[in-house]
Amino acid sequence: MPTARQALLDAAHRALDEGPWRTVRMVDVAAVAGVSRQTLYNEFGTKGGLAGALLRRAADGYLAGVDRALTAPAPDRPAAVALWTVRAARQDALVKALLTGCWAEGLPRPEHRPGPRGRTAGRPPPTPEELVALVRERMVAVSPGAAAGRCEIALRLALSCVIVPVPGDDAADSRALGLVREGARVAVPAGLSGPSRTAGGRSPR
């Protein structure tokens, strides 16, 4: 059985699927979740706090998918992460916005203003640079040496597909995945080292 917090986040996400964030009302979110409005405010403090928690959950879910992709056989890991990145961004506009920093009309945005905070307000959602760095760190940790370079290239190519999506369904994703594999292989031939440490904090371009 979901906790009150999980139920509230689920209700908020459903409300976002049905209309722009600016029209989402806290009282309606609480009603759909089956909890009191006071419980909602205790958890998140403000509507901005709810938005931040929704964004953090989207980021955490995306990173959990990255971890699953990295359980693939070593040669397939860069492509598996790339495919997950493209699909996750296509399926969830919040993930796409978190990865690219491009916030479509109607999406909640991170807020950094001081104000009331719920008892579990927690950390702010990651910036695109921070989120990509977390993915890169995970990829490099399980792919030492030249494979780290292929991970870097695969991630950059995947983000390019997120910014300019390939039209179509899973078949189109598979074609894009083939391009990612080939691009990573050509860009970082066997025997070359991984990306420079000094480049670790830079966002893909």
Regions found by a protein language model. Give the residues of each.
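Basic, helix-initiating cap at the start of DNA-binding domains
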Residues: 1-32, 49-52, 57
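Short hydrophobic/aromatic patch on the recognition helix
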Residues: 33-44
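Solvent-exposed, amphipathic alpha-helical segments
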Residues: 11-18, 61-69, 156-165
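Amphipathic alpha-helical linker/stalk segments
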Residues: 56-80
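An extended, acidic
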Residues: 79-205
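Residue-level recognition of oxygen-bearing side chains
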Residues: 46-49, 94
